[in-house]
Amino acid sequence: MVKNQAQKKGVKRKQVKNIPSGVVHVKATFNNTIVTITDPAGNVISWASAGKVGYSGSRKSSAFAATVAAQDAAKAAMSSGLKEVEVGLKGTGAGRESAVRALISSGLIVSVIRDETPVPHNGCRPRKRRRV
């Protein structure tokens, strides 16, 4: 007698973990904004991007799309018990500040905001300048 599909196929059911604190990684590029929420060890709890929440093309690079993506990721992470986060910002896109504001307004306590934008110490040669 099989009780449900999970027992039938031998698939483990996803357990809801209680994680009180975590790290939010916001990658704001010129084309998109990606928000990843991890536990302190680096295991991903939830993620969202402007493309995942339904925006496409040039609308993905807007600040409002970053706000919606941050709210979506925060809501999914708060369902697993997340309350306090540290924020790491990477990149120079339009959604940097608006993503942090959305995290605060969604109910997460932001303890630290760090800028982790990679800056080369004169490493690789950049692409040629765009002439429009």
Curated annotation (Swiss-Prot):
Domain of life here?
Bacteria
Gene3D superfamilies on file:
Ribosomal protein S11 (3.30.420.80)
**GO molecular function terms listed in the Swiss-Prot or TrEMBL record:** rRNA binding; structural constituent of ribosome
Q: Which sequence ranges form a coiled-coil region, renumbered to this chain? A: none
Checking PROSITE patterns in the record gives:
RIBOSOMAL_S11 (PS00054)
Q: Which SUPFAM superfamilies match?
A: Translational machinery components
Q: Which UniProt keywords apply?
A: Ribonucleoprotein, Ribosomal protein, RNA-binding, rRNA-binding
GO terms in the biological process aspect are: translation
Q: Give the record's GO CC terms.
A: cytosolic small ribosomal subunit
- State the NCBIfam families in the record: PRK05309.1, uS11_bact
Q: What does this protein do?
A: Located on the platform of the 30S subunit, it bridges several disparate RNA helices of the 16S rRNA. Forms part of the Shine-Dalgarno cleft in the 70S ribosome.
Q: Which family does it belong to?
A: Belongs to the universal ribosomal protein uS11 family.
Assembly behavior: Part of the 30S ribosomal subunit. Interacts with proteins S7 and S18. Binds to IF-3.
Q: What is this protein called?
A: Small ribosomal subunit protein uS11
The species is Chlamydia trachomatis serovar D (strain ATCC VR-885 / DSM 19411 / UW-3/Cx)
Task: Write the lineage as a comma-separated list.
Answer: Bacteria, Pseudomonadati, Chlamydiota, Chlamydiia, Chlamydiales
